[in-house]
Amino acid sequence: MGDYKELLFYQKAQQIVIGVDALVKGLPKTMQAQEISRQLFRSSTSIGANIAEGHGRHEGAEYIHFLIIAQGSANETDHWLNTILDIRLSQKEKIQALIEINNEVRRMLTATINTLKAKRD
């Protein structure tokens, strides 16, 4: 198994982090926006971190476990991005692009998890 940085879903997860970093720097300095910023940044960085950690476990049950955690973090990231949209903290276009990349990552993680589970069974 090559380097985790070669995985397309890892690369896209890093694109999310870069986009989220730029996004949160532009959010208002209100208590609500700052709390959402912290949660969003934490969940978005967790996606790639769990992909990387799981990749070191190779193809066993532990790898699947970490990919499932990454998927949960991607779901949480989706929640926070949609919350920002719902309460109108940022421009829809900026958020929508991140949601689309995040949705790609979620689909890729689901497909990879299903493939690994099928190989195991």
What is each residue range found by the language model?
Residues 1-121:
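Amphipathic alpha-helical assembly/interaction segments
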